[in-house]
Amino acid sequence: PIKKQILPTYIIRNSRRPLKKTQLKRNKSPPFMMWKLQIGSIPPWLKTLHRLGAWMIRTVLFSFYNAPYSLTTLRSLLDQQQMITNPSIDMC
């Protein structure tokens, strides 16, 4: 026995017929539908969002990874600059 594809039934309210169950019509061939599912189901905004999310995660991870190092280097650089610039100011 070949199983028929079960399609969702929607109840549509009409002025003439108060309640009528209607079956969803299959207007396209199954292969095309499969292809559409594989390709067309992913919206462009989702792709961009995923790219953004990946970028954000990467940057956050990177910053966390290099936070202490970068902070110390920045501090030391600033200290060095102050040490270098201060004597000249004092001299003037």
UniProtKB/Swiss-Prot annotation:
What domain of life does the UniProt record list for this protein's source?
Viruses
Q: What is this protein called?
A: Putative protein pog
